[in-house]
């Protein structure tokens, strides 16, 4: 009997991993992470708890928000993302040589299409956000939104409020109900979901690395500590 050709071989679908993954739009960061054990535990706990829908990491530039989340994603990947059905990451800072920031419209078009919306252009901005939330929330979805601050109001009377109605709707809906988890990194607390901080959308202020953890990171990067330190 002649051997079966590759096109005729029946392959069983792989189990134990997400149906779809897209993380290429997240920023490229270093692989070395030190002194973030409590933050990793916080993320693991949030993913395991059904009552937690959104977590937000708050810190200024350079503290390591994106590096932390990328490291956690690598840990999740090694365990087939722990029951996640869909994994999607987006940075509001464009990657590559062009740089700049991405708009809410760009985000909506990409995410509605990726999550299977039949007509991403249909409806108002608010309606699109609500529709996207439904597509995300009713599956065990891991959604990572990196660098939200370009779409938030700066410090002032409306500090931290998201300026785009579509994202306001998305985040409000996910805070109210979400079978999975949305992880946000930003420089400012998200005012639109502040009323959920004590329940389904806790925030975590990311601290600077301790001196010991910082020294380990420098050694890993091949940088010698100064004698004065």
Briefly describe each language-model feature range:
Residues 32-33, 89, 205:
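Conserved beta-strand positions that form and line the central face of beta-propeller blades
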